[in-house]
């Protein structure tokens, strides 16, 4: 029986979240979700056509998949709040990933505007998942204002550079009670497994899958990696040692005459 991941008022059996951007065609989305086992998909509200034309991304997302609209494009809290409300009005539910980015070079999140948006939206009944630069005091404040989880970046968005912030993420995992979902920059399944082995609650990937030579196969690889990393974390990896420790006896095998 699979372990249940309870977050945002829902119970999931997969700890891999999938992004919906950068695919060569939206028609890949059902196969990506099926191969990865993911039950949650994020999408930018600007890609949701409320007229429900053929290009509406919602046409390609299975009905049993949890929607996590994001506020991509928001430059401050007010814009993020407006996008979240539009998503709810469009029938996308109460989950929302807050992205507030005013830095156009590195696309780093504005933690302080993110806190402001989170506080307003949680008061309105949203399940808020804030994308953030990993900072313990910011994470604690997001917890205080009611975030459902925190989503620290592993590396800049779309960089595929891996878990560059591992020590800062590790601190969040150890010090706050909210689920920590590593988001952005994860480029290889091995990096997703590492995040899960550290104790992350889940991982969100997009670019690593969308830009792979075979996106469906890569989605499957990420699903397996996240599951393996979680299993390893629960198994309790052995302590590291500074010196060698033999796994077999070194004495008593050959008797001296």
Swiss-Prot record:
Reaction it catalyzes: [ThiS sulfur-carrier protein]-C-terminal-Gly-aminoethanethioate + 2-iminoacetate + 1-deoxy-D-xylulose 5-phosphate = [ThiS sulfur-carrier protein]-C-terminal Gly-Gly + 2-[(2R,5Z)-2-carboxy-4-methylthiazol-5(2H)-ylidene]ethyl phosphate + 2 H2O + H(+)
Entry keyword annotation includes Transferase: yes
GO BP field: thiamine diphosphate biosynthetic process
InterPro entries assigned: Aldolase_TIM, Thiazole_synthase_ThiG, ThiG
Main location: cytoplasm
Record's subunit section: Homotetramer. Forms heterodimers with either ThiH or ThiS.
This protein's name: Thiazole synthase
Native organism: Desulforamulus reducens (strain ATCC BAA-1160 / DSM 100696 / MI-1)
Higher taxonomy: Bacteria, Bacillati, Bacillota, Clostridia, Eubacteriales
């Amino acid at each position: 029986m699979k372990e249940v991941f309870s977050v945002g008022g829902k119970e999931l059996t997969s700890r891999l979240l999938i992004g919906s951007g950068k695919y060569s065609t939206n028609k890949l989305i059902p196969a990506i979700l099926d191969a990865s086992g993911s039950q949650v998909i994020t999408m930018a509200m600007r890609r949701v056509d409320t007229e429900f034309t053929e290009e509406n991304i919602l046409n390609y997302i299975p009905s049993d998949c949890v929607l996590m609209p994001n506020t991509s494009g928001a430059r401050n809290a007010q814009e993020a709040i407006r996008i979240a409300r539009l998503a709810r009005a469009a029938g996308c539910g109460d989950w929302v990933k807050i992205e507030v980015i005013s830095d156009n070079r590195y696309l780093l999140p504005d933690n302080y505007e993110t806190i402001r948006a989170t506080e307003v939206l949680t008061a309105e009944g949203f399940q808020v998942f804030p994308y953030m630069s990993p900072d313990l005091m910011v994470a604690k404040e997001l917890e205080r204002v009611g975030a459902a989880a925190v989503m620290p970046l592993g590396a800049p968005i779309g960089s595929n550079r891996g878990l560059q912030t591992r020590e800062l993420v590790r601190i969040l995992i150890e010090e706050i009670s909210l689920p920590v979902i590593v988001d952005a920059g994860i480029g290889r399944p091995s990096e997703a497994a590492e995040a899960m082995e550290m104790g992350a609650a889940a991982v969100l990937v997009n670019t690593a899958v969308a830009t792979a030579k075979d996106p469906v196969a890569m989605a499957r690889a990420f699903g397996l990696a996240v599951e393996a990393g979680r299993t390893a974390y629960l198994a309790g990896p052995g302590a590291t040692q500074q010196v060698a420790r033999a796994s077999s006896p070194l004495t008593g095998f050959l008797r001296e005459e």
